[in-house]
């Protein structure tokens, strides 16, 4: 038996005051010291459609925990909507919020002696922030996200009915052929329900990754927020966290702890799945940060190794025609994992919050196996309801059948891949000696090799300007620098630039490179996370207009056609002048300066530098 963390304050004269406060907050004296305190880390927020319904989720989870024999204690953390923050200085705050969210959850759980944790995230930085906290705390933890939004249904001016999502309205913004009336039609129809944005963007990628790593139940990444089955998932997750809390404290079973689940092998499985489904490049940042929180030796080199050996077998929006509901119908994350298992790409001896091995889980939840349960087959039939409403659980609509077509369906088998290369790739060269990342699933085959002159800007705002005023021409490589973790600061996303080049009709004719990052909704030849970043004296700071940029995705290379001697000469010139300073007007708040002071480059997950923190604090 392992003593509950809350035991220290639930008995003895010294902590009578703490117990008095717990009583005042609604905890029964009869439960104190007998039932585990389950912290509910919610992220309800009326700014985000992905989080607007989470207050209701929190109530469901709380009641289910109480019924299962736990003491639920709900609290809230922040949530930044990247789509709303996009394209202006609000985006500087998005990535830094990840680390603050992690701190918030750690502070709350440790300050109040929580015995276990259930996390209710949904959107981009909330999921990894809570994952980082769970791995730091290492107490019994279950994740259950709010669920993805349904895709929109938009009737175009010519009468065509099109499946749409948020990215479509952003493309339309820069398309001179789209009238204001048509743009308003997109605006009203592309986001029809609550939930995280409908494609395989960052939020859904991270929720899928959480399921793959073993900290969430099947369906977490793909059951729509609007479907009644999502409500069932919340109840099951709540009961599961109480169950594993008892396993740990009553039976001393530490296999249920996050660090026991999220091992090196589990990280490799999660990244293998991510590469196979062509997830957001942001997942690279977040999985590196998570590994550091778990003290797991998983680096960009591991991601590079995996990307060479795993093909892309699922191309969802924005890289392909499938929406998240289509991926769900094809078996969801266990469907993708099942195909990877048959190809020998997974460690199936890893365990999760609900199964002793991945192999056992796939036996029950992989729709291609004869042993797949009726419960699983029914769950994966959950379909869109096409009811425009911010309310969750509005329908019980089911598909007539499952998508088991592994040649032309939403999920392919390993013998019929969408792309023989993985959906994500790490590139290196004299422009990014420490690496950079590209979502190969979203790059048209004709520009996997690219050579062209650079057009250099020092901010996203400048990038948008040169795109919209047609300074960026076909054949050019747009280099956006000083947007890294330290240089931005905050490493903002470049969704507007990638969307606007598509709106201008040159998405297949230009390259884009940045030490910042891209939205999960970005596609095209968009290379991000260049490391070292410009503000850390990276070579990207030395590039000038007209320099020839050479990119070869198959060879995993990204270079500028300059000799080492020429680069050294430019470095001397730069350091004799202004130095590594962006030429732009941007106010940077004290909060962002604090982030910049400790931020590491993207190849380290853009996390705070632990060595610098230890040095300055004087604490081990």
From Swiss-Prot:
Keyword tags: 2Fe-2S, Amino-acid biosynthesis, Branched-chain amino acid biosynthesis, Iron, Iron-sulfur, Lyase, Magnesium, Metal-binding
Annotated active site: 519
Top-level EC class as recorded in UniProt: lyase
Residue numbers binding [2Fe-2S] cluster: 123, 197
InterPro entries cross-referenced by the UniProt entry: Dihydro-acid_dehy_C (IPR042096), DihydroxyA_deHydtase (IPR004404), DiOHA_6PGluconate_deHydtase_CS (IPR020558), ILV_EDD_C (IPR056740), ILV_EDD_N (IPR000581), IlvD/EDD_N (IPR037237)
GO CC terms, sorted: cytosol
Keyword Zinc among record annotations: no
Subunit structure: Homodimer.
Protein name listed in UniProt: Dihydroxy-acid dehydratase
Source organism phylogeny: Bacteria, Bacillati, Actinomycetota, Actinomycetes, Bifidobacteriales
């Amino acid at each position: 038996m392992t003593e509950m963390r809350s035991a220290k304050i639930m008995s003895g004269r010294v902590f009578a005051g703490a117990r008095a406060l717990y009583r005042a907050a609604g905890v029964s004296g009869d439960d104190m010291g007998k039932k585990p305190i389950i912290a509910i880390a919610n992220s309800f927020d009326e700014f985000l459609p992905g989080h607007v319904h989470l207050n209701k989720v929190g109530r469901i989870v709380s009641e289910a925990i109480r019924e299962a024999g736990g003491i639920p204690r709900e609290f809230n953390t922040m949530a930044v909507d990247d789509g709303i923050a996009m394209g202006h200085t609000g985006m500087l705050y998005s990535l830094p919020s990840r680390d603050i969210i992690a701190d918030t959850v750690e502070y709350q759980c440790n300050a109040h002696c929580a015995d276990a944790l259930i996390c209710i995230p949904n959107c981009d930085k909330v999921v990894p922030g809570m994952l980082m906290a769970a791995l730091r705390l290492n107490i019994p933890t279950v994740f259950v996200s709010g669920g993805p939004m349904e895709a929109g249904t938009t009737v175009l001016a010519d009468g065509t009915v099109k499946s749409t999502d948020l990215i479509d309205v952003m493309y339309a913004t820069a398309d001179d052929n789209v009238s204001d009336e048509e743009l308003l039609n997109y605006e009203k129809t592309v986001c029809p329900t609550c939930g995280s944005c409908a494609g395989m963007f960052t939020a859904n990628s991270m929720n899928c990754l959480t399921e793959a790593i073993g900290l969430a139940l099947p369906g977490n990444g793909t059951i729509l927020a609007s479907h009644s089955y999502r409500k069932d998932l919340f109840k099951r997750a709540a009961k599961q966290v109480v169950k594993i809390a008892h396993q740990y404290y009553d039976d001393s079973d530490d296999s249920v702890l996050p660090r026991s689940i999220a091992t090196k092998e589990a990280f490799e499985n999660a990244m293998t799945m991510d590469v196979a489904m062509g997830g957001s490049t942001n997942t690279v940042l977040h999985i590196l940060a998570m590994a550091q929180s778990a003290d797991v030796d998983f680096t960009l080199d591991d991601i590079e190794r995996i990307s060479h050996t795993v093909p892309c077998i699922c191309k969802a929006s924005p890289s392909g025609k499938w929406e998240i509901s289509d991926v769900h119908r094809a078996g969801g994350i266990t469907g993708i994992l099942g195909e990877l298992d048959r190809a020998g790409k997974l460690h199936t001896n890893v365990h999760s919050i609900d199964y002793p091995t991945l192999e056992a889980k796939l036996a029950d939840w992989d729709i291609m196996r004869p042993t797949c349960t009726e419960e699983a087959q029914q769950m994966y039939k959950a379909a869109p309801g096409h009811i425009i409403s911010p309310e969750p659980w509005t329908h019980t609509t089911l598909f007539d059948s499952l998508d088991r077509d592994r040649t032309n369906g939403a999920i392919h088998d390993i013998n019929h891949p969408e792309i023989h290369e993985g959906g994500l790739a790490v590139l290196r060269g004299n422009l990014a000696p420490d690496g950079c990342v590209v979502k190969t699933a979203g790059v048209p085959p004709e520009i996997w090799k690219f050579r062209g002159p650079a057009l250099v800007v020092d901010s996203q705002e400048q990038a948008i300007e040169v795109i919209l005023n047609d300074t960026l021409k076909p054949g050019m490589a747009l280099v956006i620098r000083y947007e890294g973790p330290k240089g931005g600061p905050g490493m903002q996303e470049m969704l507007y630039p990638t969307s606007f080049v598509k709106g201008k009709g040159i998405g297949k004719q230009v390259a884009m490179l940045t030490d910042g990052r891209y939205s999960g909704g970005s596609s095209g030849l968009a290379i991000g996370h260049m490391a070292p970043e410009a503000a850390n004296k990276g070579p990207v700071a030395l590039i000038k207009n007209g320099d020839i940029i050479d990119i070869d995705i198959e060879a995993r290379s990204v270079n500028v056609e300059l000799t080492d001697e020429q680069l050294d000469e430019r470095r001397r010139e730069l350091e004799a002048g202004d130095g590594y300073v962006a030429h732009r007007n941007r106010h940077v708040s004290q909060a962002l300066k604090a982030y910049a002071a400790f931020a590491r480059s993207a190849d380290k997950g853009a996390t705070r530098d632990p060595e610098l923190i230890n040095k300055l604090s004087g604490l081990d």
